[in-house]
Amino acid sequence: MNTFGRELRITTFGESHGKAIGVVIDGVPAGLELTEEDIKRELERRMFCHIPVLNPRCEPEEVEILSGVKEGYTQGTPIAVVIWNRRVISSYYEELWMKPRPGHADFAYYLKYGRHYDHRGGGRASGRTTAAVVAAGAVAKKMLALAGAEVAGHIVELGGVEINASYTYEDVKKSWGRPLPVVDQQALDKMLEKIREAAMRGDSIGGGVEVWAVGVPPGLGEPHFGKIKADIAAAAFSIPGAIALDWGMGRALAKMWGSEANDPITVANGRPTLATNKIGGVLGGITVGTPIYFRAWFKPTPSVRKPQQTVDLAKMEPTTIEFKGRYDVSIVPKALVALEAITAVALADHLLRAGLIRRDKPLGR
């Protein structure tokens, strides 16, 4: 399906080379301030046009809110947003028709939809479709702010180069002032070199990102189905190219003795809390009030300028393809922005479920 969420539901639509990408957001209370500029601001964070090989399409985001907003405020009705596709060059993909790219969803889409799948630019499986998720995230982030919560992320690994520095949440937010959101300057320099190397080789690189959510109130999530971690993980794996996820200290935690891994419980400002936060803000599927943090990894972009073995499905014969069109050397930076967005959507959904944001009366005025 193309819908995510229970109380806050988003339905995305559109393909990479179609007329538009879009999203319908249902469940937003009336009275939330929202403009097209709010959405465009978030979309521009995913562009990275200052590093052309990360976004050769570099498409100015033309955003239109079609419904659900009047005079700068939400109406409590479904919000429909479209982002128009303008810089489309489908001719690059003509020779790839019925010749699925190794590592790409082309092959799976053929198995499911037959000849009817749209292969141009990756179609429905393109990273371009995450623009719709980012648009929904712009709304969800505003909803989180009502509860005093916010989301931010950074790149922790790219092309095998890992960060090696201690940092705080404030450092994560400040990293967005750099060419890429990386807290470690030495690692950033090496990552930029790796990007240049991949472009020269006609190849691609993967990597990992970390997303934080701070100010999230305790008590969100359910003991079994509806765990906050499960919902965020499901959302994370909806992003094209996602291959792995670590919550809190993740695999490092799995290697510890139980006595080391446990977060001691203490009292601060008259309230119980965790003295440390190795677990990443969630116990038993329920938030405990400490910061949420997790890491996700994304595979290298499947489209590369190197010969790759595939099958001509029209003839059922082996063949070789070499992509000649535009491609992102890495999807990791864009994926980070999408992961921030879908995390915000999942958390806003749970705030509505818990009654911490209500829809039965308008916000503000």
Curated annotation (Swiss-Prot):
It is an enzyme of class 4 (lyase). The keyword Lyase applies. One of its GO terms (cellular component) is cytosol. It holds the Pfam family Chorismate_synt. Signal peptide: none annotated. NADP(+) binds at R46. CDD domains: Chorismate_synthase. FMN binds at R124, A125, S126, G284, K299, P300, T301, P302, S303, R326. It catalyses: 5-O-(1-carboxyvinyl)-3-phosphoshikimate = chorismate + phosphate. One of its GO terms (molecular function) is FMN binding. Its cofactor is FMNH2. It comes from the Archaea. InterPro entries: Chorismate_synth (IPR000453), Chorismate_synth_AroC_sf (IPR035904), Chorismate_synthase_CS (IPR020541). Belongs to the chorismate synthase family. This is Chorismate synthase. The gene is aroC.
